[in-house]
Amino acid sequence: APLGNRGYCPSRDGGWGMAECYADGMGGYMERANHNTLLLPQCETMGCLENIDEILGMDGVDGIFIGPFDLSIALGIPGDFTNEKHINAVAHVLDVCKKHGKLSIMFCGGAEAANGYFKQGFDSVTVSLDISVLADAMGDIVKKSMA
């Protein structure tokens, strides 16, 4: 049985129901999923920020993923990532992750910001969105084509 609530769909995400990990049926799948799936709550609200120590202290929580845009909105400083309130909130979450030995993951918009977050001590940084990367690449192709 799954820990918590888990669905299953034998499509792409479920290996079309034919992946090697499903060879011993749903019981085997659930057992592996219970042990091989990361649980990463997103820190995007004041509630999460105010309870981050308790959240990261929970068994089964593997780390935190910070959503900086929504967090900045919750802090009352939409999109102002250089604001001291945002900087301090992000540093606090990172410190609590380190205290509990949990993963710290940050989202950012580009390579320069990613470099800064890695230097700050984050374990992983998600850079940009697939659609943004594709749009930037296509824009570059159009500019070069029209030059």
Where in this protein do the model-derived segments appear?
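Glycine-enriched alpha-helix->loop->beta-strand junction motifs that scaffold or abut catalytic
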Residues: 1-3, 57-63, 119-125
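Hydrophobic faces of well-ordered beta-strands that scaffold small-molecule active sites
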Residues: 39-44, 64-66, 104-107, 124-127
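C-terminal helical cap(s) of enzyme catalytic domains, especially alpha/beta-barrels
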Residues: 1-4, 131-147
